Amino acid sequence: MFRTMSIARLLLVLALTPLAALAESPPQGSLVIIGGALRADNAAVWQRVVQLAGGAGARIAVLPGAAGNPERSGATLVRYLNQYGASAFVVPLAVRLKGRDYRRDAEDEALARSIRQSGGVYFTGGDQALITQALVRPDGSRTAALEAIWDVYRRGGVIAGSSAGAAIMSSTMYYDAKTVFGTLSQGVRDGIELTPGLGFIGSDVFVDQHLLARGRFARMLPAMLKKGYKTGLGIDENTAMVIGPQREVEVIGYQGALLVDLTQASSDPANKEFNLSNARISYLDQGDRYNLVTRRYTPSADKAEGKVDPAKPYMAEPVYSADILGHNAALVMMTNLIDNAQAEAIGIAAAAPGEPRQDLGFQFKFSRAPDTTGYASERSEAYTILGMRLDVTPLHIVRPWYSDWK
């Protein structure tokens, strides 16, 4: 009798135990990491979020805490998600939400229960520091609300986030970041430029966003070196990476993502300025897949038969950029080099007028390594680029760069 009651009691305890207590088991859910500036008509991304949350009528908890105006941002996101078939609702938890105590809200059991009963969670854009401020206790432990979010993820739900909501996906995130050039020229510090994220993707992958549009691929490099990351994923605007429980990355939406591999990279500590040798950088286009565990790449259907033949280059012109940190400059350079008779391409980064370190610049040298591979789409001019080498070296910049022609 005693044994029977003990087993029954154990089963009852297990049934009533929050999923947070089962933290040792890997999450069974998915991540949708969006690079910001997600358009309302980007059906591929919105529909995938709803699908992964459970399909038509799925409950999705919207956390607008990063936004400058949480009420307006939350209402907008709920409207978009519901247009694509969800049953979304705003979670009233935000540092800037007027008339509320975010510390109390983060520990409210009814609020946590509403999150836990959802099939998905969506973090809006804005300031990622406000997300962690609201969800993480001062001692670094998880609030009840954050545990509920993890419960959704563990049991198979989706965690989605755009811009700031993407930044919190890794265990380290940019916080009070300088410009991209300022980050290269002045470095990064723990607790100032870099702070802990929420870590949904795991401790081994660094995530950044607005990547190609704002030249942020370059700021991934010092952050990854500082924190010891070997793998980084950067997602561009109006585009998303979907990462399932098998850790396979699928790119959907408007453009693509960059995969940064520092496995064989090195930096010369004798040079006080930022420098990096033998990094590998890949561009994953929409429809492409990459498995973070097996490191296997699967091209989209329109590129499966389009492997670039380096013996038959399409272009022969030199490739150069005087502003490698500019809008889409890195992607343009990589695309123009992968199917080119030229072996390397050079991009220059320098301080903007009024920015510190006017005498300093950086050369970004992209080159094709023996194992660099490209795939061309049969439907568009898009390419996928795998394993292009990147070396970054400091330069001395002479001012002014130019004068009137006489």
Show the residue positions of the predicted features.
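Glycine-rich, highly charged phosphate/nucleotide-binding loops
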Residues: D101-L111
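An anion/phosphate-binding loop that grips the pyrophosphate of nucleotide cofactors and donors
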Residues: S118
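Catalytic-core regions built around general acid/base machinery
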Residues: A110-S114, S141-G156
